[in-house]
Regions:
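Extracellular cysteine-rich, disulfide-stabilized repeat modules
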Residues: 77, 290-292
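Short beta-strand elements that form the blades of beta-propeller/WD-repeat-like
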Residues: 108, 189-192, 239-241, 288-289, ...
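Short hydrophobic/aromatic patches on beta-strands that form ligand-binding or substrate-lining surfaces
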Residues: 117, 131-133, 193, 376-386, ...
Length: 470
């Protein structure tokens, strides 16, 4: 082959390859544009209430050069899953005890940073993530406004919300105005019940998906208040326990049934419980169960069972003779008959929790019988079904006796096959006990149920009060 023929042959081959690449690029462009418009069809809302099925699509992007072509990227596009109401129909997880989960160290961090002054913390989760809540005092700790923040109810208190484990810094969202609150996620959006106003005529604002939807005023004109922990939603209906009236005598407790922020029914408390405040509630499909605080007659904790379908309420008391409130008698002397308050150190009290496990009961309480100091958990065999049962097992120390604790409450987390129970402990610091400073605030520690093994420890607040701003 002479030189001219070689040149012609090489040119022809190059021209053929270039033409092939050109047509392939046109084909790729057409496919890309087509898939782009299909993606928008997938993400757009269905018309005329029709259901649009979204399937994964594969997009191939090719990089072409004159001599060779390489495949570089394969991506999957999946349409977002439609949100559904939660029904909590899975069984409760079988556990052997509790394992450490989270600690925010808010007070220690306040020694050198701008952290909110808070109390009444709690934890609640949406289907994907857990959040911590607390009632802020309208000030950071290193601020003169923190003076005298021992008071529970002021117009400056707001409900704070952060991802669990993130202390309440200056960028924290203030969800609503509140000196008493409860929050829960129904699977589609957050519901917040926020109480504020005058003691004798407060208002509970019902906020759903970031909007004020409903409200209810004080019905007994004496400090309307709610759970200070998560509410519970079964399918579309969320239940919130609220009390108005005396903190040391007969009060008027009601259960609100709320759908997408609208109060659809109100049921009065019924059953044998004499005084109910600050309930810690959990889903027990198809119903809701709460363990509360009797601030009048009993150191045994009242139970409130809520039927979500027919709005009926039944109340009683935890059977365990190892009782959960503070103050209380020592374990040898304490008692409970499942039905009535035990009339043992009934005045005052502290928010706490317990939950049933078949006939048994898991309980969390302060270690001290008289003070909000230390914290322990344990299971009482037949403590849910047998009057005055006292066989204790699986005891764990969460905070040692020499360190302060406070309120505690329950929250539930749905796993792949079961619903786990978790709890938080409020670690109060400052006034009244610690008079070196003028403020009162808290941090939290969080544990969750485990079916595995676990060790021992103590997880107090840990701040040196002498290093803190006054």
């Amino acid at each position: 082959m002479n030189p001219n023929q070689r040149i012609i042959t090489i040119g022809s081959v190059s021209l053929t390859i270039a033409a092939m690449c050109f047509f392939m690029q046109i084909a790729i462009l057409i496919i890309t544009v087509t898939l782009h418009f299909k993606q928008y069809e997938c993400n757009s809302p269905p018309k005329n209430n029709q259901v649009t099925l979204c399937e994964p699509t594969i997009i191939e992007r090719n990089t072409t050069e004159i001599v060779y072509m390489t495949n570089t990227t394969i991506e999957k596009e999946v349409c977002p899953k439609l949100a559904e109401y939660r029904n909590w129909s899975k069984p409760q997880c079988k556990i052997t005890g509790f394992a450490p989960f989270s600690k925010d160290n808010s007070i220690r961090l306040s020694a050198g940073g701008d952290i909110w002054v808070t109390r009444e913390p709690y934890v609640s989760c949406d289907p994907n993530k857990c959040y911590q809540f607390a009632l802020g005092q309208g000030t950071t700790l290193n601020n003169r406004h923190s003076n005298d923040t021992i008071h529970d109810r002021t117009p400056y208190r707001t409900l704070l919300m952060n991802e669990l484990g993130v202390p309440f810094h200056l960028g924290t969202k203030q969800v609503c105005i509140a000196w008493s609150s409860s929050s829960c996620h129904d699977g589609k959006a957050w519901l917040h019940v926020c109480v504020t106003g005058h003691d004798e005529n407060a208002t509970a604002s019902i906020i759903y998906d970031g909007r004020l939807v409903d409200s209810i005023g004080s019905w007994s004109k004496k400090i309307l208040r709610t759970q200070e922990s998560e509410c519970v939603c079964i399918n579309e209906t969320c239940t919130v326990v609220m009390t108005d009236g005396s903190a040391s005598g007969r009060a008027d407790t009601k259960v609100l049934f709320i759908e997408e922020g609208k109060i659809v029914h109100i049921s009065p408390l019924s059953g044998s419980a004499q005084h109910v405040e600050e309930c810690s509630c959990y889903p027990r499909y198809p119903d809701v169960r709460c363990v509360c605080r009797d601030n009048w007659k009993g150191s045994n904790r009242p139970i409130v069972d809520i039927n979500v379908k027919d709005y009926s309420i039944v109340s009683s008391y935890v059977c365990s003779g190892l009782v959960g409130d503070t103050p209380r008698k020592n374990d040898r002397s304490s008692s409970s008959n499942c039905l009535n308050p035990n009339n043992e150190e009934g005045g005052h009290g502290v928010k706490g929790w317990a939950f049933d496990d078949g006939n048994d009961v898991w309980i969390g309480r302060t270690i001290s019988e008289t003070l909000r100091s230390g914290y322990e958990t344990f299971k009482v065999i037949e403590g849910w079904s047998k009057p005055n049962s006292k066989l204790q097992t699986n005891r764990q120390v969460i905070v040692d006796r020499g360190n302060r604790s406070g309120y505690s409450g329950i929250f539930s987390v749905e796993g792949k096959s079961c619903i786990n129970r978790c709890f938080y402990v409020e670690l109060i610091r400052g006034r009244k006990q610690e008079t070196e400073v003028w403020w009162t605030s808290n941090s939290i520690v969080v544990f969750c149920g485990t079916s595995g093994t676990y060790g021992t420890g103590s997880w107090p607040d840990g701040a040196d009060i002498n290093l803190m701003p006054i």
